[in-house]
Amino acid sequence: MRFRLNDSFSGKSWTIDNVQWTPQNLVAWIMELNIGLSDEAKLLLPNGMSLNETVLNSESDVVIYVLDQNLLTFTYDGDKIPSIPSLKGQPISNVLTGIIADSSSDQWKDKISKCLSLLSDILESSSKIHNQLSVCHDEYSTSIVSPEVAMNYLQRRQSGMKDLLFVFYERLDRVSVSDLLHDFLALPTGSLPITPLKILSTNWTKLDSWLNSISARYAEAQKRVQQCIGAANSIIVSPFKEVPSIKEGDDAYYHLRSVAQDAANILQEILKIESTSTTSQIKPKCNYETEITDCMEKLQSNLSELKSSRKSSLISLKSFWLSFYKVSLRYDALYEYLRQIAEELDRSKFVLSQSRNIFSLYIDILMEALRRTEWQESYNVSHDSSLPLDQEKELSLRKSWLSHFSNLLFNHGQLKYLPVLTRDEISNYLLNIQAHPNYQTFHQMLSNRLSEYLGFPGSPREAVSNTVQANNSLHEKLAMYQNRCNNLEAMLSHQNGFNYNINNDGLSPNAPHPPINEQSNSSQPFYRVSPSIVPLNVIRKLTNRKTSFTDSHILRLQDEVNQLRNELDLVNKRNEDLLIELQGKEEKIQYLETENEEVLQKYENLQEELSSTRKLLTKNEAAVAEQQSNEEMHSNEPNILNLYSVFEGKVDSLQELYNAFKLQLTSLKQKGEYATLAKDAEAVQHIIEERDYALAEKADLLKLSENRKEQCKILTQKLYTIVFRCNELQSVLRECVTQPGFDSDNERDGHASIPDRQIEFNSKDLQYLYWMDGEDADRNFQEFLNRMSSLDFDSFHNFVVSVLTQAHNHELRWKREFQSNRDKALKAILDSQSKVSLRNFKQGSLVLFLPTRRTAGNKKVWAAFNVNAPHYYLNTQPHLKLESRDWMLGRVTSIEDRTADDSTDKWLRLPSGTIWHLVEAIDERF
């Protein structure tokens, strides 16, 4: 890139080429120029936009105008014009004439050398004059254009201030802090050591007057903006004269060079001649002295006119720039005034926001006091070597928490050292505040926060109610399970006539409970060691309790729960013994498997028949395809009818097999019932289990039957296409047989002339595909055959293929777009990591830091190069070595917000109460 820095008054310019723009390079280059710029200097683009507000792109040429009142001290010396040597003493034509007249003279070579030296001096002087003419013309043009750039700058600032006033008007919030805090001040605190009056600032009553003063300052800002606009309109921008043309001087300069070069060439030729006898043959082509003299006069006169015009324009420009800088200073003061109003508005919005959320902040303060109390207790108990680190971490945590509260509304001295607060005190306060209907929302908020802190999913009362409900449901389940076990034991004892003991793998309702093994819980699964049922007396105690949980209550409740869990483990163990007994008796049911094997064998035979039928149909389909290519197609009609009859026979056989299978299932069911009735009374329980097992086997057989039916349906759908093709072939054959003079060509033509039929699907058509589900299978099958000719599988296949192809194309296109978008996102992320931030500074931002005129002690104060983000100061560290540097590009590691204080922060020169930012950064080297 190429940068050109223009002095708006004198028109001087400084240029740097072939650089890649970065803020530090630009600032370092301007500082190296040492042109006497002040801190209030403004760098503008031709459109009047400030360089601080612009992000330059990769343009090849960038023009920057400098506006600074210190540059008005420039004095223009327009009288000094470089002189050009004269040819009157030794004209070239006289030299040539003297050489021709006095051929015997030996001094002609010296004269020619002097003439050549004179011509060289003339060319050098004219080149200097021409360069001065070009520079003067460029500076003149720059100084004439600069007022327009300055006025554009003022117009942009006017529009920006108007927009800022509009934003201020929208952000003004005309509410009273006293009204917002009325309910909070009336909040009953009981015995809490933290009250609303203690945490509020002593000057919170003055906040309403402070908010009113902001509104008054806004009205004053409106007046000042109008005054600045009027002052800007009063600046007289007189129409400046156009820059004189330098075309005449350019023409004279180039003509002078041409004539002088011709004369020098002639003299060089004369020097090459050894004798003067042939010099008469060289004739000058023109009068060199006259032409060179005329060109020199034109060049000097053009430069003189341009300098005089520029001198007069600088006089008129100086009055304009003096007026402009006066108005600009007013704009700067107004901008500082508006900036202070903006800061006050930000602080007021923060105060009003915290006033509206005062109850939530009060809850935060209570929970912070509780956290500090418990942390101090754990800190006093522990004796770890990392205590200093824990203390430092706690201090930083408290400092960060305190920074979230406004010092205008809250008393930071009280918040910094909160009193001791325990869980019992907060629990008692919750019970007391529940009696006040106006603070139910606050009660709910505090209950939720306390529940979150204690680890409950809800409030303590909700936790108790949920526990009671869960215990009631578990108690009901336990009673139900106990009744079932008692009934089962009674049934078994009635069947066997005696009680089983524990050693014989049996159970007795009157038998004593076995001892509890304390180590058995660890080996049991998780559902066996789940929390037991809480008895009703414990639930009544919990519901009648008015105080919150304590550690002793929780331990007592845990002991009772453990006892009940042990009782439930005994019941579970008895159930496991019963299950072991039942599993041993399930082995007797294996005799049913022999009967099931016969059924499975019949199913396998049926599957073989279906496979053979499928093969036969495949062969028949191939035969039909061959018959279509045969010229004597009418002779195959009996074969088609036979195939159709064979198909009907196969379907009838399948139907018979299905009916036989249903009869077999019925007989098996009857056999199972007869066997169950024939069993002895003492084996009733075993028969019930056997029946359940038989029912499960029946369900499996039914599923297998359904699978076979699905296979039959698939076979039917495949036969649909064959029948449709056969019907088409049959219709063609009939038409061909009835036509006289039938031949193969006519047959093919007639077959090709059959119009294609498009199939329209509806819900009734789909019913025919599942004809086997109906009651009247024969009638449904006949309807199914009648509808077969209306389905076109080719059209359906083409439609499905087109949809899948389109979906595949969409997938490929989306993959390419995803790859492209991902590359763009990665590139944007990499670009953002190396881009210098000018506002919205945060941790990880790349910031340019520059030294200021202010000093703190013996060190300079460094500030961040910003756009509408002032008061960001660098925390200077020795390892940064800033004493020998003019700039630093750093990566922000942390930002600490502070408030200006006249006693400690005098070096900032900021109003008291102004928020400024201390930035920690590390050096970023490229």
Curated annotation (Swiss-Prot):
GO terms for cellular component: Atg1/ULK1 kinase complex; cytoplasm; fungal-type vacuole membrane; nucleus; phagophore assembly site; phagophore assembly site membrane. Disruption phenotype: Impairs atg8-processing. Pfam families: ATG11, Atg11_middle, ATG17_like. It comes from the Eukaryota. One of its GO terms (biological process) is macroautophagy. It is a peripheral membrane protein. Its main location: membrane. The modification Phosphoserine is found at S548, S552. Keywords: Autophagy, Coiled coil, Membrane, Phosphoprotein, Protein transport, Transport, Vacuole. Residues 461-496, 548-671 form a coiled coil. The modification Phosphothreonine is found at T550. One of its GO terms (molecular function) is protein serine/threonine kinase activator activity. It is found in: Preautophagosomal structure membrane; Vacuole membrane. Belongs to the ATG11 family. Homodimer and potential homooligomers. Interacts with taz1. Involved in cytoplasm to vacuole transport (Cvt), pexophagy, mitophagy and nucleophagy. Recruits mitochondria for their selective degradation via autophagy (mitophagy) during starvation. Works as scaffold proteins that recruit ATG proteins to the preautophagosome (PAS), the site of vesicle/autophagosome formation. Required for atg9 anterograde transport from the mitochondria to the PAS. Required for nitrogen starvation-induced sexual development and for entering the dormant G0 state. This is Taz1-interacting factor 1. It comes from Schizosaccharomyces pombe (strain 972 / ATCC 24843) (Fission yeast).
